[in-house]
Amino acid sequence: MTTVKTNLLDLDRKGLRTYFAEELNEKAFRADQIMKWIYQFGCDDFDQMTNINKKLREKLKRVAEIRAPYVSQAQHSVDGTIKWAMRVGDQDVETVYIPDGDRATLCVSSQVGCALACTFCSTAQQGFNRNLRVSEIIGQVWRAAKEIGIEKDTGRRPITNVVMMGMGEPLLNMKNLIPALEIMLDDIGFGLSKRRVTVSTSGVVSGLDQMTGNIDVALAISLHAPTDELRSQIMPINDRFNIATFLESVSRYIEQSNANRGRVTVEYILLDHVNDDMEHARQLAVLLKDTPAKINLIPFNPYPGSPYRKPSNSRIDRFMKTLMEYDFTVTVRKTRGDDIDAACGQLVGDVIDRTKRTQVKQHDGEQIPVKTV
């Protein structure tokens, strides 16, 4: 009978120590040694772990494995951005490497597809398939680090930042998200600063409240409209958690967070003549007057079949200046990797079958109403 091996990438430090103690009858420091080999040296071969005795290495080869997603396709943009289709099981998710000056950001997926049906997002058109496991989330970071040259100088900047802004809604996969974040932050894992790991959410309040007091990372919120009426039209999640409820949850999280330095990043996609009028800017400023926020404007990136258009530069500029009149810090996101469909809202896995979503999807016990497409 074939033994089902434990994928060590599914375990954070606490889980790995428990596994070593209860399943292998080994001490905690051995688990820590293995964790360093995996994440700090990019090692997936027990035989190469030279400070581990041979008896333990042989035992690990029988019962455990280090199995990350593998790259099934890679596309390189002229601006240095790389998009990888990473194979998880029999499907692909997309992971994007974005170099920019002295930093390099990795955009990581949390689900295969997405159930939230945001009308401006190409990923949403796929529907939802499943949540990613811990090994499939953290494995994207592990594989990307290998691809850009963790063991040798490739001339590419190592990963300095991770953003959970790829395929899926992270807070609908809390069971697997939290351990993956713990590994990113762990000093014997990837050792990233909590200010350099960002979770973006479309407004799953139940998940955000679960994060509050349990994990401290930077927070970005996908707001995209200043009123409930408009937001519900383009983001059906608003029918479950309206703007006021969402912002109250954000305030609770920010109050206990050191990573956010007292303010949240508000993401606002600009859709031509939909949510980009000057009145929308004024409404947004009033809405956020009691929320310490940095506003990141995201000009829409068109994709085939989309009903929306990117606003003109003059409309983008007027919207930004209107917000700045209210003393907000406002940035306009640079479009990166759009020539390889890697820009925000364009993450579409070519090999994933396009399936119609049901009216209600179940995730981690949370029922979220969605619209069919």
UniProtKB/Swiss-Prot annotation:
The record lists [4Fe-4S] cluster as bound by 114, 118, 121
Q: Where would you find this protein in the cell? A: Cytoplasm
Q: Which cofactor does it need?
A: [4Fe-4S] cluster
What Pfam families would the database entry show?
A: Radical_SAM (PF04055), RlmN_N (PF21016)
**Which keywords accompany this UniProt record?**
4Fe-4S, Cytoplasm, Disulfide bond, Iron, Iron-sulfur, Metal-binding, Methyltransferase, rRNA processing, S-adenosyl-L-methionine, Transferase, tRNA processing
A Gene Ontology biological process term: tRNA methylation
Chief site of localization: cytoplasm
Renumbered to this chain, the signal peptide range is none
Q: Which residues form the Radical SAM core domain?
A: 100-339
The UniProt entry annotates the active site at: 94, 344
Cellular component GO terms, alphabetical: cytoplasm
Task: Tell me the disulfide pairings in this chain.
Answer: 107-344
Give the enzyme's EC designation: 2.1.1.192
Q: Which family does it belong to?
A: Belongs to the radical SAM superfamily. RlmN family.
Q: Say what the protein does.
A: Specifically methylates position 2 of adenine 2503 in 23S rRNA and position 2 of adenine 37 in tRNAs. m2A2503 modification seems to play a crucial role in the proofreading step occurring at the peptidyl transferase center and thus would serve to optimize ribosomal fidelity.
Q: What else is known?
A: Reaction proceeds by a ping-pong mechanism involving intermediate methylation of a conserved cysteine residue.
Q: What is the protein's name according to its record?
A: Dual-specificity RNA methyltransferase RlmN
Species of origin: Photobacterium profundum (strain SS9)
